[in-house]
Design a protein with these regions (language model features):
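Membrane-proximal helix-turn-helix segments that form the acceptor-binding/catalytic region
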Residues: 47-76, 84
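Conserved donor-binding/catalytic core segment of Leloir-type glycosyltransferases
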Residues: 107-127, 131-140, 146
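Nucleotide-activated donor-binding/catalytic signature segment of Leloir-type glycosyltransferases, i.e.
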Residues: 158-176
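Short alpha-helical donor nucleotide-sugar binding micro-motif in glycosyltransferases
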Residues: 175-176, 183-188
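Aromatic "clamp/platform" in nucleotide-sugar-dependent glycosyltransferases that forms part
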Residues: 196
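Short hydrophobic beta-strand element within catalytic cores of glycosyltransferases
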Residues: 213-217, 227
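Conserved acidic donor-binding segment of nucleotide-sugar-dependent glycosyltransferases
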Residues: 229-240, 249-254
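A short, well-ordered alpha-helix in the C-terminal region of glycosyltransferases
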Residues: 249, 256-270
Length: 273
């Protein structure tokens, strides 16, 4: 890929698989993530591939294509240390990590802590919003949860809310516009973001830019590059009881949300272009 009918192409920046497979003499990698199902997710419930000969061949071919294409890059960057670590572990390559600000940087604001914890993201199993919903059964009755986003798990999550009798306390908001997203961050007590081994996770940065503490899990990956337990949020085991205990502490400790949120802002305020 060197030109199109309108203009020459002097630089190609690959981000996700398979974009970085494109061949170009001036190719740079800005790695968001690889095809994780044939790397770190292989052998977990989050991969579609098993140990059959056919699956093993697919894994081999994808990894072979990756290493060829990645070695063609003149410079390697990764979106977070977690993504860079996988590149080192599986491909033997080193990448620099300049953290990118979220798309709405400069527009986030803060407000007084509200009566809800906020979550945002795709409703799928790796984002683990079911964990937040189950944790609400362990949290004070006056605390609510509001979750923005859509995805394949929405119906299952709605069913879980009904099963646990949390219809009045947990709300799935679906897709929302930017202004409402900013408002929901600003008005929250804190932000839940505990996916499984996330590459980076803009939500953590968005929460801290809104001066809100983040509740994450010990196996959440990227968020752990920013969240320090008891300093700007909570890092807990991925269990309903542990998340519920963090929610309870946040909801019942006067001034804690503001203190942790302020420390979070200090942690990410320098992430700019």
């Amino acid at each position: 890929l060197q030109q199109d009918p309108r203009r020459p192409i002097d630089l190609v920046i690959g981000t996700k698989f398979p974009s970085y497979l494109i061949r170009h003499p001036n190719k740079v990698l800005w790695l968001v993530h690889q095809f994780r199902q044939v790397y770190d997710l292989l052998g977990t419930p989050y991969s579609d591939f098993g140990d059959s000969p056919e699956d093993r061949e697919i894994v081999r071919l994808v990894r072979e294509m990756d290493i060829r294409a990645l070695r063609e890059c003149r410079t390697l960057f990764a979106i977070a240390k977690n993504a860079a670590g996988r590149l080192r572990r599986f491909n033997g390559l080193e990448a620099q990590v300049p953290y990118p600000p979220p798309p709405l940087a400069g527009r986030y604001r803060t407000g007084a802590p509200g009566d809800y914890v906020f979550g945002a993201g795709r409703l799928d199993s790796m984002k683990r919003f079911d964990l937040l919903i189950r944790a609400m059964a362990h949290a004070p009755a006056e605390l609510r949860a509001r979750i923005a986003g859509d995805g394949p798990d929405r119906l299952a999550l709605e069913g879980l809310i009904d099963q646990l009798g949390l219809r009045g306390r947990v709300e799935l908001l679906g897709r929302i516009d930017d202004e409402r997203l900013i408002d929901l961050f600003a008005g929250s007590l804190g932000v839940y973001y505990a996916p499984y081994d996330e590459d980076f996770g803009y939500v953590t940065i968005e929460a801290f830019l809104s001066q809100k503490p983040v509740i994450t899990a010990a196996d959440s990956g990227g968020p752990l590059e920013f969240v320090s337990d008891g300093v700007n949020g909570f890092v807990v085991e991925p269990s309903p009881a542990a998340v519920g205990a963090a929610l309870t502490r946040l909801a019942t400790s006067s001034g804690l949300a503001q203190r942790l949120g302020g420390a979070g802002f200090d942690r990410v305020r320098g992430i700019t272009w």
